[in-house]
């Protein structure tokens, strides 16, 4: 009996520690959220080195900060393209959220500024590359390896949700691996501060929760569904719902039917049935106990949540890095000259950036 009592006391203590941490974190976030500063650096402060990725309205480059010689990832967004693709609100959200959050498994924003043509977000550089490329290379991760990553996402979402933030874009491409083998969630382009429900259709087809597809108002529970998709994909090597056309993927998602590979253990299957749960009144993370239903589920029985948060657990995989500015874990992209207009574009739309 004694042993059980100490275990439950430990749980109570841990819960108290978490609550205190989150309360403090919320105060710090609220303060930065309200301040929402503009222009904290300039393009001339950085040497642009190489493109790490491209998107529909911009690119990400590794840069070196001239005064400190530190390396960063600079996200460059073309204002006119952002406006054309109706992503102004999303982009302002992204910058406002990034400048206010601070958590071990979330990428942090160090500087931001704009010029006549572009918006710039200078983020910490994470040299290990995307989880996506490592997962494709090895096929699938073992359950302990998958669990190590999943635990970090659980903690990151617990933090974000406590701040009334929905992430909405979980997928292996948006998870970077740092030099210690831990995760950093990147790309807050779809993140949003929401106290109740929201209706925007956004995300990646394979990872969309059924309520988003069905155009219902939805809440933070969409992130827990996406966690289920991610855990499945890490442990299987492919997502639970896939097809050639998005419409076929959506049909599978809303059907509520999931098939598991034979190598999945029973605890993993149980967790996934509770995360990939179409019925919101039954989905883990969305019930009375909140995130604790997930943290206390059997698949996570061996997880020391505090030790994960403190990065005290040895990572199952350390990416090869030749130094702080190494880009060998990223793909190569065609380089393009940065064109900056002589007149200011979209001043009104991005006044608060």
UniProtKB/Swiss-Prot annotation:
Modes of activity regulation: Activated by cAMP.
Keyword vocabulary terms for this entry: ATP-binding, cAMP, Kinase, Lipoprotein, Myristate, Nucleotide-binding, Phosphoprotein, Serine/threonine-protein kinase, Transferase
UniProt: ATP binding residues: 52-60, 75
Domain Protein kinase per the UniProt entry, residue ranges: 46-300
Reaction equation(s) it catalyzes: L-seryl-[protein] + ATP = O-phospho-L-seryl-[protein] + ADP + H(+); L-threonyl-[protein] + ATP = O-phospho-L-threonyl-[protein] + ADP + H(+)
GO terms for cellular component: cAMP-dependent protein kinase complex; cell body; cytosol; dendrite; mitochondrial matrix; neuron projection; neuronal cell body; nucleus
Tissue: More abundant in adult head than adult body.
Record flagged with keyword Lipoprotein: yes
GO biological process: anesthesia-resistant memory; anterior/posterior pattern specification, imaginal disc; cAMP-mediated signaling; cellular response to ethanol; imaginal disc-derived wing morphogenesis; modulation of chemical synaptic transmission; negative regulation of mitochondrial DNA replication; negative regulation of nucleocytoplasmic transport
Molecular function terms, GO-annotated: ATP binding; cAMP-dependent protein kinase activity; protein serine kinase activity; protein serine/threonine kinase activity
Matches recorded under Gene3D superfamilies: Phosphorylase Kinase, domain 1, Transferase(Phosphotransferase) domain 1
Pfam families from the UniProt entry: Pkinase
Ranges for domain AGC-kinase C-terminal: 301-353
Catalytic residues (UniProt): 169
InterPro entries linked to this entry: AGC-kinase_C, Kinase-like_dom_sf, Prot_kinase_dom, Protein_kinase_ATP_BS, Ser/Thr_kinase_AS, STKc_PKA
N-myristoyl glycine lipid modification positions: 2
Family annotation (CDD domains): STKc_PKA
Top-level class of the enzyme under EC nomenclature: transferase
UniProt similarity note: Belongs to the protein kinase superfamily. AGC Ser/Thr protein kinase family. cAMP subfamily.
Quaternary structure (record): Composed of two regulatory chains and two catalytic chains.
Family annotation (PANTHER family): CAMP-DEPENDENT PROTEIN KINASE CATALYTIC SUBUNIT 1, CYCLIC NUCLEOTIDE-DEPENDENT PROTEIN KINASE
Job description of the protein: Serine/threonine-protein kinase involved in memory formation. Promotes long-term memory by phosphorylating meng and by regulating CrebB protein stability and activity. As part of ethanol response in the glia, mediates ethanol-induced structural remodeling of actin cytoskeleton and perineurial membrane topology when anchored to the membrane.
Protein name: cAMP-dependent protein kinase catalytic subunit 1
Organism phylogeny: Eukaryota, Metazoa, Ecdysozoa, Arthropoda, Hexapoda
């Amino acid at each position: 009996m004694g042993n059980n009592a100490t275990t439950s006391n430990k749980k109570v203590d841990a819960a108290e520690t978490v609550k205190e941490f989150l309360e403090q974190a919320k105060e710090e976030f609220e303060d930065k959220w309200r301040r929402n500063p503009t222009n904290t650096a300039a393009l001339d402060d950085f040497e642009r080195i190489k493109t790490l990725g491209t998107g529909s309205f911009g690119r990400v480059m590794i840069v070196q900060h001239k005064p400190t010689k530190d390396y960063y990832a600079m996200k460059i967004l073309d204002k006119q393209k952002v406006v054309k693709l109706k992503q102004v609100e999303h982009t302002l959200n992204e910058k406002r959220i990034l400048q206010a959050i601070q958590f071990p498994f979330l990428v942090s924003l160090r500087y931001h500024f704009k010029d006549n043509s572009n918006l710039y977000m200078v983020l910490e550089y994470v040299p290990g590359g995307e989880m996506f490329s490592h997962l494709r290379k090895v096929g699938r991760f073992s359950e302990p390896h998958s669990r190590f990553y999943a635990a970090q996402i659980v903690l990151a979402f617990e933090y974000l949700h406590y701040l009334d933030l929905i992430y909405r874009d979980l997928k292996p491409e948006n998870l970077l691996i740092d030099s210690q083998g831990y995760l950093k969630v990147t790309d807050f382009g779809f993140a949003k501060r929401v106290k109740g429900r929201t209706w925007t259709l956004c995300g990646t087809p394979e990872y969309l929760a059924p309520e988003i597809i069905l155009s219902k108002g939805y809440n933070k529970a969409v992130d827990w569904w996406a966690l289920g998709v991610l855990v499945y994909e890490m442990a299987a090597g492919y997502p639970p719902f896939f097809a050639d056309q998005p419409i076929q993927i959506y049909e599978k998602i809303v059907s509520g039917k999931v098939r598991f590979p034979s190598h999945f253990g029973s605890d993993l299957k149980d967790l996934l049935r509770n995360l990939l749960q179409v019925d919101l009144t039954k989905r883990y993370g969305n019930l009375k106990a909140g995130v604790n239903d997930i943290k206390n589920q059997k698949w996570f029985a061996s997880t020391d949540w505090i030790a994960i948060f403190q990065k005290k657990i040895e990572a199952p995989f350390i990416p090869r890095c030749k130094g702080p500015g190494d880009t060998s874990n990223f793909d190569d992209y065609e380089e393009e000259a940065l064109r900056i207009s002589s007149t200011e574009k979209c001043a009104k739309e991005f006044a608060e950036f």
